């Protein structure tokens, strides 16, 4: 994968998250902000989830209240390099915990 392909795929990830939150109808308020390639989700309780791209490694990094995760593209899925879980699984787990209600991005 070259750098432009990596950015195209990361942009698609960001767009999916942003579109899901734009149509979010849950009770919790979840704000989404994108600044310089970093996507920040802010929750009512003051906690945050930060998602950024590591261009030199062609990885997407996810920082949650619980832990940090690094994802490599395997086929068409971003997979955690430690646990083997998908990006969407770990993002939904963290967002659900931090929002206090079920959050889905798929």
Curated annotation (Swiss-Prot):
GO terms for biological process: iron-sulfur cluster assembly. InterPro entries: CyaY, Frataxin/CyaY, Frataxin/CyaY_sf, Frataxin_CS. CDD domains: Frataxin. Keywords: Iron, Metal-binding. NCBIfam families: FeS_CyaY. Belongs to the frataxin family. This is Iron-sulfur cluster assembly protein CyaY. It comes from Salmonella paratyphi A (strain AKU_12601).
